[in-house]
Amino acid sequence: MSLQNFVRVHNATLSFWQSVVSQRVRQQLELTGAKVSHNLLLKHPAIAATAQHVKLTAKGTPPGPDTLDLTDPDQQMVYLSHLAYEKALCLVESDVQRAGAFDTEYRKYSDKDIIGFASCVTTFAEYYLKYAGVFAYNDWKELGEDISTYGVINENDNGNGFSLPSDARVAIIGDWGTGLADAQALLVDIIERHNPHCIIHLGDIYYSGTPEECVNNFSAIIKNAFDIAEKDPVPVFTIPGNHDYYSLGWGYYSMVYGLNSEIGTAAFQPASYFCLRTEDGGWQFLGMDTGYNDSDPADQADPFYAGPWLQPNEIEWHQDKLNNFAGATILLSHHQLFSSNAKINGAWSDFSALPSQNPYLYQTFLPYFSKIAAWIWGHEHNFVMFENDLLGLSKGRLLGCSAFEELTSSDPYAINYPDIKNFIDPETGNMIQLSTNADLNGVTYYNHAYAVIDFSGRTNPTDPVTTTYYEYPSWGDNPPDNPEATQLYQEQYSLPAVSEVQVPYLANTYLLSQDGQFIGPEYKDYPYMSNDTPVAQQFYPVVVTSGNYLTHGDKLRILTTDSSVGDKNQLGAFTRKSLYYDDDNNDKTAWYVYKRDTSNGMDIHYGDEVYFVNADWNQWMLPYDSVGLSVLYLTTEENANYYWSITLPQNSALEGITAIPKKSPYRKKHLPFMKQEKNVIV
C-alpha cells in the first residue's frame, strides 16, 4: 500500500527530512531512466522507512533498539532514517559531539543504507545553514511599495498582468500539492469540464515546499494538466500553507514568482498574499498568508502559541483592500477560522478554553464581516459547509481535500466541537458530505473536492454569484475506470443582508469607523482607536423620540463600558482637541445621531452607517492622528461627514483578544524574495 507511506506531519524539520529523502530517491530512480511519479516514489523502501520513522517520531516514540527489531532489514532502514535525521539536526545546531554519537551508531548499520541517508544529512544541513533559519516573505511596507497597488493582480502590471473578466469562472482547490496521480487528474477534470479563467490554490505543497517539490508536485503538474486537456493555460494563484514554509518559504517564493510565465500566462503574483478583482468592480478575492506563523518548529513547543495570525503589515494591507472596495469580498486562507473537528489552539495556549476558533483571524476580519460574502479555507483534508452566519460570518467553507488521500478511518466528520455547527441541507435534512471510494486492497478514502465560482449572469456588479462544489474520486493506488466529477452542492454567495435588527438603547454595541477601526481602550480618560480591541459602548437617550430604539435625529449620550473610567463614562467634546470621558450632563456630552441614508426609513439598525454630531459644537465626531503618538484619538470637526457603523459584538468570548499575539518567546526573521533569486535550489 504505497499511499500508507504518504505520511504528513505538523512538524517543520520532519517534513523537510521527508523532502530531502524523497529528492534523493527521485535522483537515483532518474539515473535508471525511469519516469518518476510521486506514486512510484511512495513504493520505494527508503520512502516507506522514512514514513515510519516520521510517524513514530511525531507521536513522541522515536524509533530505536527498544522499539524496533534491528535484525529485520526493513526496520533497520527505519532506524537509519532516524539516526541520519538526528545527526542532521545536530549539525544545524552546531552540536558536533552529539552528531558524532549518532554517526557512530549509524555506521553499525551503514551497509543497509541503500539510498545514502548520509548524503541526505549533508543536503539537510546545508539548506538550513545556507538560509540560517531566515524565512522568505515579501512585506510591502519593508519593500517601500504602494499599499494601494502592491499585490493587486491587474492587467497593467508593467505589461505582464491579468484582468478577471466580469463573467469569469474561478476554480478553487485546496491542499492540492501532493504530486499524486489523482491530483493531476482532478485538475484536468476542472480544465476540461469548466474552462476556468483562473485557478486559485489554498496552499500546502508536500512535504515541505522545497524548490524541487514546488516543481514536481505543483508547477510541472499544472503544465502537464493543460497539455493533457489540450487547453490554453490560464493564470494560477496560490497562497502558502504551513508545509510551504517548512523549508523556510524559499521554494514557494521561487516557484510563485515564475509560475505563470512558465505555464504560459502573463499574470504575476509578487507576494504570498494577493487581491484579484472582477473588471466591473463588483467582487474581489483576498488571499492571505497564514502559513508564515505556523512554520517554525518552536510553534509546537511555544506555550503561548495559538492561531496562526497574519503579519502586522499584511493586516494593514487587507484593511486597505476592504476599506477601499465597495463590492463584495471572498476571503481565502490556508488555515481555518473555526472547526468542528480539529483543535486550533493548543491545550497550554492562552486560548485553550476556546479550542475551535482562531481568535487572531477573527479579530482581524470581524469589522468587515458585513462586506465578506464567503471565506474559504483548507488545512483540514475534508469538505465541510458550516452553518451560515456562524459567529457573524456569512459563509465559512472548508475545502482542503483536492488531492490529499484522507482515510475514512481518520473520521474527519467527527463533531468534536458541537458549538461549531455544520450547514444542513434544507432539502435532505443532512450535512453535505463527501462520498468514499475503496481501492483494490479494501482501504477506503474520502473523495476529493473543488469549487467553481461563476460570476456570469449578474445584472449589477454586486449581485450574487453561483458557487458549485464537486467531488472527484480518490483512488489510492488503483484508478477507477473513467473517473469523473459529480456535483455535491450549489449555492449563492452574496453580500450579507442589511440587518433588520434595530439598535436598542442601553445595549452593548461597538462603534466601527469608516476606516475599519473600533473605538477601543482609553488612556487617562482619552479613548483611542483600535483594530482589534473594541470596547463596548452604550447609548443613553437625552430626549426619547421613538421609544426604546435609536432613530434618525435622536439626541443621546455615548457611555463607555470601560470600568477604568469609573463614573466619568460619558464621551464628550470639551475645549481640548481630543474627546475624553467625563460626567458632565450637558450638551458637551450630548450627540445627535443621523443615518447616512434614510431611504429605508428613520429607524437605525445594526450595520447602518451613521453620523454623530456634538450638540454643543455642532461638529462631526471622527478620529485624528495626534502628532508624535502611535494611535488615533477622537475629535470633532465641522462638516466632516465622517460616518460610523453600529455593530453588535459577535463573540463575547473573544472580546479583548488582539489580532496578533501580545507576546511570544521567539521572533522570526525574514528577508524579501527578489526576482533574481528565483533559481534557488536545494
Each language-model region and where it sits:
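Short, Asp-centered acidic motifs that coordinate Mg2+ and/or phosphate
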Residues: 170, 197-198, 328-330, 374
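Active-site glycine-centered loops adjacent to acidic/histidine catalytic or metal-binding residues
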Residues: 175, 203-204, 241-242, 288, ...
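Short beta-strand micro-motifs enriched in acidic
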Residues: 388, 454-460, 596, 624-626
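Lectin-like carbohydrate-binding module/patch detector with strong preference for beta-trefoil
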Residues: 500-682
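Acidic, histidine-bearing metal-coordination/catalytic regions of metal-dependent phosphoesterases
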Residues: 1-198, 223-238, 444-447, 452-503, ...
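Extended active-site neighborhood of metal-dependent phosphoesterases/phosphodiesterases
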Residues: 119, 126-159, 212-325, 329, ...
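Short coil/turn segments at secondary-structure boundaries
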Residues: 183-187, 212-214, 250-252, 299, ...
